[in-house]
Amino acid sequence: MEISGVREYLGDDWKAVQDLLGSALHSGIELLDTTNENLLSHSGKQLRPLLSLLISRACLKSAGVSEKLTQVSWRYAAAAELLHNATLLHDDVADGSDLRRGVPTVRAMLGPQVSVLVGDFWLVRAVSLILGDNDSDYNPRVVKLFSQTLSSLAEGEMLQLQKAMSADTDYGDYLRIIYCKTASLFEVSALTAAISVFASKQLEDAARDYAVKLGYAFQIKDDILDYSGTASVGKPLGVDVREQKITLPLLGAMANCPQKAGRVREMVKKIPDHGEFADEIISFVKENGGVEYAAEKLNVFVDEAIGALDAFGDCREKELLKELALFTAKRTW
């Protein structure tokens, strides 16, 4: 799947979202504007607005409506992207990250204070897009959904920190963390997209189900790449375990080799004082099928995401959503 081809297919809708992002991030303050422009030029695949626009258009076509998308759909799509990047700017400070998507982070270039402030700016501009310019733009349900997502993002970070200290993450904890930190933002992107075109309850539910499963698959793939990726991923291998994060590949390896699970968890606890334990844990994961275990779970979520698309009528957008799910499993970045 070529993301550039999907953007081209989305045409004026994609351009409208990009224009909104550019205008929303303009401040008239040189340092802030230069930083924002640099971030936008390295903003990755922008999967959340891509997902949002595809869902909006799929809902319209499934309902047999020939109308085009309006600024409401564009605003929600752009807001999701701003919110996503705001969390990354804050995450880079919390994690002490020097690289993001293969380029230096704002934290590394300009310091943690600037990264936090820029993240705050992106967050506020996301809220502005959600609210709209006029009273008629205000949708209390959408505001509540984005608010719940913000809460989930914070809760996920805190739960991950708590579990990193205790090294007792289990599969249920892991799913909750990746729902809060990743899947919830996919979910709100898709659900507000459906709401923006007045989709039926059936299509809303299908959009939500697809997006949550896609989000799970996306994060599991990220966690797999942390153990088996290459330099093209944009970050060194083993970052998660060095930060004491027990993700699905490690959970899988411990499930496959339970007699060593207790010792491995103790090693995770001691990584701050024994950095060499990280390399030993990475080897343990590779030797005990942890990556393969996670890949099997990933494929289940991909299949479930594709299954959720059955509620939509046949259209190019539906096919692209299917391709997006398959692409998530195969990507190498």
Question: Where is each model-derived feature located?
Answer:
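All-alpha prenyltransferase/terpene-synthase fold signal
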Residues: 1-333
